[in-house]
């Protein structure tokens, strides 16, 4: 059976391209998620979405001598660190359609594809990957000293902020004992972070504490642990995000 580009449906979620190959007369449905990494101008393919067993087998293969040698050689030939030849998007509600193990397309075409027993699926997968790469060739137009951010990096950043928000929205101020995000005034819904400890305060309460201490000539210290601090940082999250 020949690969037919007409049967491809393309969509995207959070910088992930989703290719769906649908051939209803032959009862064939194949979904391939691809991320194009602009930093090293290559492509990463989600093998979990193709078949979860492929991801498990890849992890086992990578630990064996043949896998380690292949990864070492691929890293050398591409100039990409071994740790950057694979990426993972975690499973959560926001990522339910794109989560999984993404690996360098070379690993898919030259290694993983041979683990697929259905030769028709093999052929279609190879055709999908080659079709996508041929139609999405990237030519850099930024100066060599300009650092670009990849789609995977963007997703990781969004995940980090989502996690930080989820934890922050439950935090209470250690002075007024109110949930910081539930305060009546919007300007009060910020944390005041001390550089000396990790105790939680809303920006309003810790500023009042700080001002009162200054007015009375007392030391600037944490209301809970009494550790002296030098500055207060206003933040939307309960701790600084690196």
UniProtKB/Swiss-Prot annotation:
A zinc finger (RING-type) spans 173-226. Belongs to the orthopoxvirus OPG021 family. GO terms for biological process: protein polyubiquitination; symbiont-mediated perturbation of host apoptosis; symbiont-mediated perturbation of host ubiquitin-like protein modification. The keyword Protease does not apply. SMART domains: RING (SM00184). PANTHER family: IP09428P-RELATED (PTHR11224:SF10), MAKORIN-RELATED (PTHR11224). It is found in: Host cytoplasm. Keywords: Host cytoplasm, Host-virus interaction, Metal-binding, Modulation of host cell apoptosis by virus, Modulation of host ubiquitin pathway by viral E3 ligase, Modulation of host ubiquitin pathway by virus, Transferase, Ubl conjugation pathway, Zinc, Zinc-finger. PROSITE patterns: KILA_N (PS51301), ZF_RING_1 (PS00518), ZF_RING_2 (PS50089). Gene3D superfamilies: Zinc/RING finger domain, C3HC4 (zinc finger). The lineage of its organism: Viruses, Varidnaviria, Bamfordvirae, Nucleocytoviricota, Pokkesviricetes. This is Host range factor p28. GO terms for cellular component: host cell cytoplasm. The keyword Lyase does not apply. Its EC number is 2.3.2.27. Residues 21-131 form the KilA-N domain. RING-finger E3 ubiquitin ligase which catalyzes the formation of both 'Lys-48'- and 'Lys-63'-linked polyubiquitin chains. Plays an important role in virulence by acting as an anti-apoptotic factor.
